[in-house]
Amino acid sequence: MKTEMDAKSGIKEDVAALNEHLHSLDAAGRIELLAEKFSGRIVATTSFGLQAAVMLKLLRDHAPRIPVVFIDTGYLFAETYRYAALLQEELGFEARVYSPLVTAARQEALHGREWEGGTDGMNNYARIHKVEPMNRALQELGADVWLSGLRRAQSSGRSQREIAEKQARTLKSYPIIDWDDGKVERFMRDHRLPCHPLASAGYVTMGDWHSTSPGSESSRESTRFNGEKYECGLHLNSGQQDFQI
């Protein structure tokens, strides 16, 4: 009879074997493999951020049936909403939009501007506006496999991530995790993908308007959440038993 420890060990071995296979493939091959292996239980996410067009183009070309989830926090830049509309029209798809259960106006009226309340406030804001909607998306779409466009070059906290990993009950994979900024730029140029409007305004990363500021590539991690942290919470274990992430 398998113990809980045996089960966890088996999961780690499965992920290790999957990573070994994924390492031998390019980004397109990784997406095709995952789409076939986990058909019917896989989703992808997009933030419609600065480099989102890359993953969206790869998905449209190599796995167009994978649902694309967009978490609308209610606090994105106006330019991001317009860019989202442009990319969906250009690439010919419609994202599945998930929003918080509470409106931005109600949240602020009852709890204030939580993102100004230090790490605890930012974490609670992320749980309500990002983690809960994403968890709901996974549950409603029947998915336990999640594709994301994270890259090691984006931050020190992402530099050691593998192509695939377990996050709570969800298997996550990052098909372009090993792409550097130059490769991203070449791909966008070669495929004539439109750039986010704020890329020319000095932004090197993109999130909510209240917690993202312009900056240089060398200071990318200080441009989010007043430099107190980089991850919004979606790519960290929620630590809650009723969450998939």
Language model segments and positions:
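Nucleotide-activated chemistry modules centered on ATP-dependent adenylation/adenylyltransferase
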Residues: 2-245
